[in-house]
């Protein structure tokens, strides 16, 4: 996720930020038996799909898998700047 954001926006992230994100992905993997690469791919695909309909702030995006008893929930916090005009009221 950080690699994608860095490539798109050209922002540098500190080593601490990168290490923190990697640790978070490892912890999610341990709790849900989902690989960090799977979660990263999921985030990238969510960005791709949601960006068709809305302008979002990728750097503020947070996608996690949370476990409670025997269930896993996908929790996404995605800051939306605005809806794209072509998507408003369009039907597929």
UniProtKB/Swiss-Prot annotation:
Keyword field: Cell cycle, Cell division
Name assigned to this protein: Cell division topological specificity factor
Homology family: Belongs to the MinE family.
Listed transmembrane segments: none
Record-level GO BP terms: cell division; regulation of division septum assembly
NCBIfam families reported in the protein's UniProt record: minE, PRK00296.1
SUPFAM superfamilies: Cell division protein MinE topological specificity domain
Functional summary from the UniProt entry: Prevents the cell division inhibition by proteins MinC and MinD at internal division sites while permitting inhibition at polar sites. This ensures cell division at the proper site by restricting the formation of a division septum at the midpoint of the long axis of the cell.
Stored HAMAP family: MinE
Lineage top rank: taxon: Bacteria
Pfam families the UniProt entry points to: MinE
């Amino acid at each position: 996720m950080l690699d994608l954001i860095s490539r798109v926006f050209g922002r540098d992230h500190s080593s601490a930020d990168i290490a923190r994100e990697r640790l978070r992905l490892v912890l999610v993997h341990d709790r849900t038996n989902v690989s960090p690469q799977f979660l990263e791919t999921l985030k990238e695909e969510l960005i791709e799909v949601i960006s068709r309909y809305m302008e979002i702030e990728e750097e503020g995006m947070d996608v996690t898998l949370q476990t409670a008893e025997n269930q896993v929930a996908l929790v996404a916090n995605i800051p939306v700047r605005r809806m794209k005009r072509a998507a408003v009221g369009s039907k597929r």
